[in-house]
Amino acid sequence: MGGVVGWKRKMVRKERAEIAAQNIEVKVLEGTEIGPQIWQLFYQLYERTYAKRNGTRGYLTEAFFQEIALTMPEQIAMAVAYQSDIPIACALYFYDADTLYGRYWGSVAEFSYLHFELCYYRGIEFAIEKGLTKYDAGAQGEHKIIRGFEPIKTHSLHWIEHPQ
């Protein structure tokens, strides 16, 4: 947090303290540590997030998440929040040799600052622990700027194979 000005550091500390005050514990699981029950919960929360946002179920299927869990576990991590040992929220990350990519998140209910804890602060910690030099927390959101993320130009290229 060295590059974050004083009032922002104070805000981050306050937000993180609020997580503890809500009796929320967060664990970051990697690859095969993410069991089928957590994946199932994650997908339910993913759908819930999209339903709230735009009335859809999201554009990725449960089969997609099952497939990536099997085929690329070494590039996946998930921050899971627990309250009284019950999982209540998840944030999915992908990573390569130098970059962490934060992409999807969901929660069973609204909790103060939990989105920031899972999607930003735990991601930053994970990236540091893994020696990753960049954290791409995704597009949009002015709330990211005051938490230390600077806007950058991003290029994206996708190839979607169709079986026909």
Predicted regions mapped to residue ranges:
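A conserved beta-strand-loop-helix scaffold within acyl/acetyltransferase catalytic domains
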Residues: 1-112, 158
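Acyl-donor binding region in acyl/amide transferases
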Residues: 97-159
